Amino acid sequence: MGFVKVVKNKAYFKRYQVKFRRRREGKTDYYARKRLVIQDKNKYNTPKYRMIVRVTNRDIICQIAYARIEGDMIVCAAYAHELPKYGVKVGLTNYAAAYCTGLLLARRLLNKFGLDKIYEGQVEVTGDEYNVESVDGKPGAFTCYLDAGLARTTTGNKVFGALKGAVDGGLSIPHSTKRFPGYDSESKEFNAEVHRKHIMGQNVADYMRYLMEEDEDAYKKQFSQYIKNNITPDGMEEMYKKAHAAIRDNPVHEKKPKREVKKKRVNSTKMSLAQKKDRVAQKKASFLRAQERAADS
């Protein structure tokens, strides 16, 4: 079919229908959302849970949500800015941090529903494929589906780091190894060791070592926060191991204590009758003095 020019006449504008607001803003992929939200008709009022992952410039947001007519209901949430509490103070938006955030979300959710002792997940990080299966005689594994939003789902994307963390944490999320770092599209093989290196931050550690040898100034500029916190390439794996253990020990969110604000009285107090009379007398006196000066001059 050749090029067809759109004729923007009266009929075009009369029949024109705008897309949804969040589509116009480039925030929601409604094609994907429809498939993630609509539940099987034989499941009636059972919610269809989504694991929402969003990566911003300084944070990674992970949430478990389900859709209602009124809007999405958030069941549980975890953020990368919580990781300093668990010992990860730098690199809060890399692949290793995404894994930690996904793990934190999974452990927090299972703790909330009392399933954390039944579904431990994969404690030893191997980077290999792992799937959670329901235990007989116990409540079934918590199942949800990955919602990557408008992120480009290429191999090695940080969204899949959060997914792997959640699966290792004990959530049942349908997935394959094709989008994890270490998968070779040509040979169709998955190298779990490469994936484990990314989870443990060894790709960052290797780059740190490279810059230390090649360009000292670039290293100091790029990894200034690592230097400030005394984090070396050799100690990075241990840092993430401790963080994973700390997350499993206590995934519960701690609310910030409310700041007590001292209220300042802004409205002025009313003047008494005597004060009002005194002010009138002062104004009269100043007016008369000004009149006398004007007469003398």
UniProtKB/Swiss-Prot annotation:
GO MF entries: 5S rRNA binding; structural constituent of ribosome
GO BP, sorted A to Z: ribosomal large subunit assembly; translation
Biased composition (Basic residues): 255-267
CDD domains: Ribosomal_L18_L5e
Localization per Swiss-Prot or TrEMBL: Cytoplasm; Nucleus, Nucleolus
Keywords of the record: Cytoplasm, Nucleus, Ribonucleoprotein, Ribosomal protein, RNA-binding, rRNA-binding
Stretch list, region Disordered: 253-297
Subunit structure: Component of the large ribosomal subunit (LSU). Part of a LSU subcomplex, the 5S RNP which is composed of the 5S RNA, RPL5 and RPL11.
Function recorded in the entry: Component of the ribosome, a large ribonucleoprotein complex responsible for the synthesis of proteins in the cell. The small ribosomal subunit (SSU) binds messenger RNAs (mRNAs) and translates the encoded message by selecting cognate aminoacyl-transfer RNA (tRNA) molecules. The large subunit (LSU) contains the ribosomal catalytic site termed the peptidyl transferase center (PTC), which catalyzes the formation of peptide bonds, thereby polymerizing the amino acids delivered by tRNAs into a polypeptide chain.
Similarity remark: Belongs to the universal ribosomal protein uL18 family.
Protein name, entry field: Large ribosomal subunit protein uL18
